[in-house]
């Protein structure tokens, strides 16, 4: 049977040869990064492989229902010495378009291990790696992992199905923004047939918001302003800390409000996550490509959903955004 990805067998061969495998979950982990990583983690464990999941940030509590998520090691790549890297002979880099997205630091290179990149971001710039599988037509990296499993004739159990379904649902905002709707819905249906627990996903990830998270969303909406063609909201670090820096607030406002306002083509939500460090989320309607705006600011992503990090005070950030737009 013809394989979906010509690189499938090559990737599987490298996995079979490896003795100790590292899988990343990117900074500010979302459902796709966690879902695709935990699905691959479970699969490789079933193959008898020694596997470690790493992330530069803590995994949100409401995503820990995914099997394997409670095994993630939170590491600081700045302090990750050669001695800690040495045991690993393969690094699977998922859903990460740049080094800083992998490490959480702007100027840190990845450790000297054989690397395989699997991603769906067209702006991916991780070029100095052994294998690159970039499918920008996929709605989520979890969708690529699903197709790899199909190419490998790997049997997906209900826990792996839940991880993959969660990744796809998360990156498409529960199928609202799938790139290839027909294909994505077919995959989602198959995962449900294989036992994916949709109800647990909804209960844990979408219907279990912390009170401070909701308050932070309200504050962000209150500060929203409009300009020609777009809306934006900028939250300073003092306000962010006031509500305990709730994870996911920026992304939720971006996904559900920034691109949904009548008469405006796109939105920008910026949080000062540390002193003079702003994380930006861009969301747009169908015909507006915000990945190009993000790219000019050193970030990247998809046509209708992208991100970037800007360094400076709030006035400098506003000026940088105005210069680009």
Give the ranges of each region predicted by the language model:
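An acidic intrinsically disordered interaction segment
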Residues: 1-9, 108-115, 136-145
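Hydrophobic helix-and-loop "lid/oligomerization" segment in the mid-to-C-terminal part
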Residues: 2-28, 33-67, 71, 79-90, ...
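Short, motif-level signal for alpha-helix interfacial/capping segments enriched in acidic residues
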Residues: 3-10, 96-98, 148-151
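Glycine-rich, phosphate-binding/catalytic loops in enzymes
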Residues: 39-41, 108-111, 133-134, 186
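Short, hinge-like loop/turn segments at secondary-structure boundaries
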Residues: 68-72, 110, 133-136, 284
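Active-site cofactor/cluster-binding pocket
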Residues: 73-131
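Conserved beta-strand scaffold positions in the cores of enzyme catalytic domains, especially
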Residues: 115-117, 132-133, 230-232, 269
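Short alpha-helices
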Residues: 118-187
């Amino acid at each position: 049977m013809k394989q979906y990805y010509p690189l499938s067998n090559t990737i599987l061969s490298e996995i079979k040869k490896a003795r100790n495998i590292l899988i990343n979950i990117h900074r500010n982990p979302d459902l796709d990064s966690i879902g695709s990583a935990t699905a691959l983690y479970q699969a490789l464990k079933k193959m008898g492989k020694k596997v470690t999941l790493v992330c530069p940030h803590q995994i949100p509590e409401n995503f820990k229902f995914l099997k394997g998520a409670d095994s993630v090691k939170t590491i600081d790549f700045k302090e990750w010495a050669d001695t800690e890297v040495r045991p690993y002979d393969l690094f699977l880099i998922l859903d990460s378009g740049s080094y800083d997205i992998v490490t959480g630091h702007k100027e840190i290179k990845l450790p000297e291990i054989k690397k395989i990149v699997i991603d769906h971001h067209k702006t991916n710039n991780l070029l100095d790696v052994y294998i690159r599988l970039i499918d920008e037509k996929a709605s989520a990296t979890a969708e690529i992992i699903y197709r790899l499993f199909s190419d490998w004739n790997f049997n997906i159990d209900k826990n792996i199905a839940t991880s993959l379904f969660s990744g796809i649902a998360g990156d498409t905002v529960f199928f609202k923004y799938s790139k290839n709707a027909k294909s994505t819905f077919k995959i989602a249906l198959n995962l449900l047939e294989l036992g994916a627990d949709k109800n647990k996903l909804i209960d844990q990830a979408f219907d279990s918001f912390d009170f401070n998270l909701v308050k932070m969303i309200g504050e962000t909406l209150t500060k929203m302003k409009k300009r020609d063609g777009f809306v934006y909201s900028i939250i300073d670090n003092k306000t962010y800390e006031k509500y305990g820096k709730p994870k996911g607030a920026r992304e939720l406002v971006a996904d559900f409000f920034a691109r949904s306002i009548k008469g405006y083509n796109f939105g920008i939500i910026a949080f000062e996550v540390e002193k003079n460090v702003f994380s930006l989320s861009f969301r747009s309607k169908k015909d507006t490509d915000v990945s190009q705006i993000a790219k000019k600011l050193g970030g990247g992503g998809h046509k209708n959903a992208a991100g970037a990090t800007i360094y400076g005070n709030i006035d400098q950030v506003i000026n940088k955004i105005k210069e680009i737009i």
